[in-house]
Amino acid sequence: MVAKIRSLGLQGIGGYEVSAEIFLSGGLPQFDLVGLPDAAVKEARERVRASVKNCGLDFPVSRVTVNLAPADRKKAGTVYDLPILLGILIASGQARPLPPDAAVIGELSLSGEVRPVRGALPMALAAEKAGIRELYVPAGNAREAAYADHLTVYPVHTVPELLVHLAGEKKITPAEPPMPSEEELLFPDYAEVKGQENVKRALEVAAAGGHNVLMVGPPGSGKSMLAKRLPGILPDMSREETMESTGIWSVCGLTDEKRPILRQRPFRAPHHTLSAAAMAGGAQLQPGEVSLAHNGVLFLDELPEYHRDVLEVMRQPLEDGVVTVSRAAGTAVYPSRFMLVCAMNPCKCGWYGQPGGRCRCSEKSVRAYHAKLSGPLMDRIDIIVEVPALAYDELRRRPDGESSETIRQRVNRAREVQRKRFSSGTVSNANMSPRDMERYCSLTPEGDALMKDAFHALGLTARSYVRILRVARTIADLAGAKDIAPEHIAEAVQYRTYDFLISSSPEVTP
């Protein structure tokens, strides 16, 4: 007899339907798995055999052949344990068949418990597309999978529980989609940050237009503190963004029963010792940091300390919003549209340009330190802002700045203007094409005159001109202005005149 169980698999961060076909035949007892299984799938034979026996059931004394179709796609992970076991029990007459529009996923323990798997939400979305209406998943994945529409998700704790449900004796209660809690949406507040009003304003502009930022300042000036509060002023994620980000985190095993859905915008701050593979994506086609930060913020502290090859792999995601990972296991394309926020000291010791003569670096040493900055990466940074050390009086003063919520309301209004402006493709001012800029970056006569003066006086390049115009458009959006006025140009130019950086590299000078 042949039993067919509908299941699901993962490739990259996308799911696809898999059919587990189980055939019991005569001959010497043997358990064969075919269909390009990896080592984890092959080990399912021992987990399934032990689970059947420890649940008080009989493992067939016959030849068991399991085919995971389509047979030309590699199968990985432990997600097929439960469908294989259920197919064997159905084929041997020890379990009732599943409905034709039902699918099963889950890892087994040796005692018959059903353990969580990675990628529950992407597989649930794939189940929807495949016309599946009932999905049996590990209880630890149920709330995550239930976020998919038009799908009844049954949380399964143990094999006997599933068998009793299929027999109609005691039904499993379907899982409910997770509701957001206040704790999930809490962020550190900018009201807690003393001083640095100019930097807060620069980060507000960056958040409103999706611009990449570089903060330069001495140790202890608050660069990391300011960066960590940036997600709190970004707009809430849409349902589509939530599904994308949750899917990526789920494939990496970063979701759990307590936090099944990612509702906060991601904030990733990888250490400067990470490898290029960890940044872009690993050997097993796992998403890297640029994808884990999708729809959120990627914070690189001590930017010059990162290996150059690590910084270079960010060029494609910053340009295209996706990253292509090619490894021996195959090729995968992951979404990776994020805000890049970088921080660095002005020199190796950190005290260049500070009063008191604390810096011991030579000018040659400072230039060499700045030359570590990747030219193509700096090309994609719109806002560069100095973060000065706080004076004693500022440290003693009680924080009296605006709250993140107040700033966020202005950011939301500016983002809504951009959403209405760009019908498709472009999602923020930072991603404007030359055609978009021609259409939407109109300057007042006074604004045009100031832009011309700044261009000649500062020796700006064409690239700097484009960056200034994009940032000025965002500043105008925050002000509710249709055209770009002189005050918008003046503020945008301020974010490009960074005399506190010295470098022999032409890419990091205006």
Describe the residue ranges of each PLM region:
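Conserved, well-folded catalytic cores of nucleic-acid-processing
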Residues: 23, 39, 47, 51-58, ...
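Peripheral, non-AAA+ core regions of ATP-driven protein-machinery
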Residues: 1-214, 218-224, 464-465, 482-510
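Short coil/turn segments at secondary-structure boundaries
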Residues: 100-101, 176-179, 255-262, 423-432, ...
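Basic, amphipathic alpha-helical bundle interface domains used for macromolecular binding and assembly
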Residues: 34-45, 58-60, 67-77, 284-285, ...
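Conserved ASCE/P-loop NTPase catalytic core
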Residues: 201-369
